[in-house]
């Protein structure tokens, strides 16, 4: 009988976030059902569609939250004063193109994620609300978040380049669930 380190073994009902946390510390995660290890999970398994959809769902939820908080903080598109003229022009052009195609949308829906994040996270209270301690941390997180988002969207490797971001997202998700 093979012995496993206790912190490598999770119960069958554990969350995907629990699996990610184990794989942050170990090469393998073992799943136990009825007292027996029945499954081995490795980091490479995190490339599979189910995990990628889970992560993309979290990415999408985060983007929606940032847009919602931006719209609440700056009603009537007053957030546009926070953007450069060039970036705002690109957002307007995208909105106009979407409308031409019959897709009704708000201007904020056409602003790039990094721009929305930068607008919102320039506000010290928002930085703290999202659990960051400095603007430098925010900028790094935005860059890593975008990398993960882009790699997910374009079916690129996420384990090699985005593992730290995946682990942080899993921890954050667990804290949200625990708080609820």
Tell me the role of every PLM-derived stretch.
Residues 1-8, 42-45:
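Bateman (tandem CBS) regulatory domains
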Residues 13-28, 36-180:
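Amphipathic alpha-helical interface elements
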